[in-house]
């Protein structure tokens, strides 16, 4: 009986000691989550260019110059967070513009909502390429594309899916018939046409012990409003994609079908 009481006493003392040490740590973590956080970053990039089709440049051994300067800001307070990136390129590559800028709300550890200039969930992300020039998909608005809208993300151990609605591309002018401003990071359908009311869905299943194999599919459908005819066409796309995330290797593969139906003066 005495031994039993002694063991119980030891257990009680040990439990009390553990609570004494663990509780302040938990309280500290909770306190840190309540404090506003701000993370600032950026980059400065230069570029050496030697083009085989430019005789003058070949004669002088190429050119070395300024390429891009960027500023990043990430902030959070409780469940609200934001992400902003501004880039300033050389004049030949577009000058300055906002690459992304959105606010978000964390519903829980797996679910969140983003609102603003956020990345379109279509195909491999963030990039469908391994080089400075990106892939052809970037130049048709299907790689690292950012538009104005709202996006829901669920990301769990094995499954990730995203659902989004985008009102339009990055809009800097709000006239009745003004064209989409060229000061944008993303490639979009522009000129006398405007992307409107676009819906996106993306699903990824993670395979392997370390989830290094990611197999997914993406769908996209939206309107294309013509400023001259005041008619709305449409565009839609479907993609299958796979990515291997190894320690030293990264393999990407993607196939897609894209279609555009414009309502220009010569088509109606």
Give the role of each language-model region:
Residues 54, 127-129, 173-177, 229, ...:
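Outer-membrane beta-barrel and related beta-rich outer-membrane complex signature
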Residues 33-53, 60-171, 203-209:
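Outer membrane beta-barrel
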Residues 22-24:
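N-terminal signal peptide c-region/cleavage motif recognized by signal peptidases
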Residues 205-268:
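Detector for outer-membrane/organellar transmembrane beta-barrel domains
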Residues 171-228:
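Loop-centered beta-sheet repeat module
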Residues 2-14:
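Bacterial N-terminal signal peptides that target proteins for export
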């Amino acid at each position: 009986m005495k031994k039993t009481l002694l063991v119980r006493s030891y257990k009680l003392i040990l439990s009390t000691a553990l609570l004494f040490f663990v509780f302040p740590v938990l309280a500290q973590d909770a306190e840190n989550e309540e404090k506003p956080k701000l993370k600032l970053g950026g980059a400065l990039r230069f570029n050496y260019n030697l083009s085989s089709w430019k005789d003058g440049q070949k004669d002088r051994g190429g050119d070395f110059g300024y390429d891009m300067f960027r500023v990043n800001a990430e902030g959070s307070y409780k469940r609200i967070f934001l992400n902003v990136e501004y880039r300033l390129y050389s004049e030949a590559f577009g000058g300055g513009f906002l690459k992304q800028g959105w606010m978000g709300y964390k519903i829980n550890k797996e679910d969140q909502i983003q609102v603003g200039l956020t990345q379109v969930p279509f195909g491999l992300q963030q990039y469908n390429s391994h080089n400075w020039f990106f892939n052809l998909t970037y130049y048709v608005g299907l790689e690292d594309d950012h538009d104005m809208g709202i996006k829901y993300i669920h990301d769990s151990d094995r499954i990730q899916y995203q659902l989004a609605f985008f009102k339009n591309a990055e809009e800097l002018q709000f006239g009745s018939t003004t064209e989409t401003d060229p000061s944008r990071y993303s490639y979009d359908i522009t000129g006398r046409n405007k992307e409107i009311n676009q819906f996106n869905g993306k699903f990824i299943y993670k395979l392997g012990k370390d989830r290094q194999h990611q197999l997914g599919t993406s769908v996209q459908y939206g309107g294309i409003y013509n400023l001259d005819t005041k008619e709305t066409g449409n565009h839609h796309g479907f993609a299958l994609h796979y990515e291997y995330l190894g320690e030293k290797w990264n393999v990407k593969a993607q196939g897609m079908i894209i279609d555009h139906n414009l309502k220009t003066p010569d088509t109606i």
